[in-house]
């Protein structure tokens, strides 16, 4: 039984509340807390000038601002602290304020605690956003008012009083958001797990443990959806407290969702043919299977099929940007891990000219070389990791005699120009970096948009 939001309203009134981070999700949160009568102090590394109108607006509303390099020095003396998702709970300033007696939480935790609607929580290393979007589209097609939040969509806590019990909520949840989550999801979906974000987590085990929080607090009436073909998520079944549902791209799963001989099935019934799905690639087949088995109690097979045969995909995910002189340019900027890039490469029916490299998340690139080489015609490298990636392809050449031509460049503009020079009619060029963007761009979306801008100016 979900808690009554009146309880939070009574609790937060007149409380001294610190909000760490004045970003996209926390601006609506801060405004909501003001509306509920809290005394808010907002903390951010940005300066007043960088925040612009946001800072003047908050000051006019009576919000105290602690900004600049040492912005967390004054995180003390609060009743409640809302942290940003990327802020570790064991960071020195949060440990200190917790010892003082502060209640430390996040926008997402409070939303899950008080949301009356059925919640679908989706996590995984790859496919989270696409699966989240597919689930939301399927629910909308069935006629549900559907709210999308977490890593995508809009911050939902500020809208919690508008969300009705008969609505549906779909949340994309990262390992950072889940690290402190101790609340049940009605339906928890784990698309797959592979090494990722090892620059932020102590090790792979901590990353897995964070992801497990999506289902560890469930009860007997809740549901966990796992990928039968992913060793780590399949292993979660032993710890599940509610119903477990499986999906598989490689075997028949009697009561689950599976792919066989070009057809996607749900509980033994055909939903759609693979060739009729608009977004290509086996990774998208898996995303659909996860969505079908997750929503089977809420949605008809007819509406599942309708979405699969009409949904064009999410921006920055194997997105066709343009065709010039018979050469197709794809933006797969979301691919911030080798596994994700491999999935993208396998979506094409021919070898591609691959643009890769970026910020170093301390991931291993051997799989990209050992499994990816049959799909790569030319490799163009840039960014912090270009030498690391080059080394694994050179090792492949030394050990197996398999040579991939490698070009090194300094900028995305140079990469696109080099790809254009190398391409012949009928070729495919894809930006699928296998790395995060932070060495050159603030996020993968800005990287993808820059790529599209460069391609559209050719």
From Swiss-Prot:
Molecular functions per Gene Ontology: ATP binding; UDP-N-acetylmuramoylalanine-D-glutamate ligase activity
Membrane-spanning intervals of the chain: none
Any one GO CC term of the record: cytoplasm
NCBIfam families: murD
Binding site for ATP: 124-130
InterPro entries per record: Mur-like_cat_sf, Mur_ligase_C, Mur_ligase_C_dom_sf, Mur_ligase_cen, MurD
Function: Cell wall formation. Catalyzes the addition of glutamate to the nucleotide precursor UDP-N-acetylmuramoyl-L-alanine (UMA).
Pathways per UniProt: Cell wall biogenesis; peptidoglycan biosynthesis
Main location: cytoplasm
Principal EC category: ligase
Protein name according to UniProt: UDP-N-acetylmuramoylalanine--D-glutamate ligase
Compartments it resides in: Cytoplasm
Catalytic activities: UDP-N-acetyl-alpha-D-muramoyl-L-alanine + D-glutamate + ATP = UDP-N-acetyl-alpha-D-muramoyl-L-alanyl-D-glutamate + ADP + phosphate + H(+)
Biological processes per GO annotation: cell division; cell wall organization; peptidoglycan biosynthetic process; regulation of cell shape
Organism encoding this protein: Clostridium botulinum (strain Alaska E43 / Type E3)
Keywords for the protein's UniProt record, in alphabetical order: ATP-binding, Cell cycle, Cell division, Cell shape, Cell wall biogenesis/degradation, Cytoplasm, Ligase, Nucleotide-binding, Peptidoglycan synthesis
E.C. number(s) listed in UniProt: 6.3.2.9
Alphabetized Pfam families for the sequence: Mur_ligase_C, Mur_ligase_M
Family (UniProt): Belongs to the MurCDEF family.
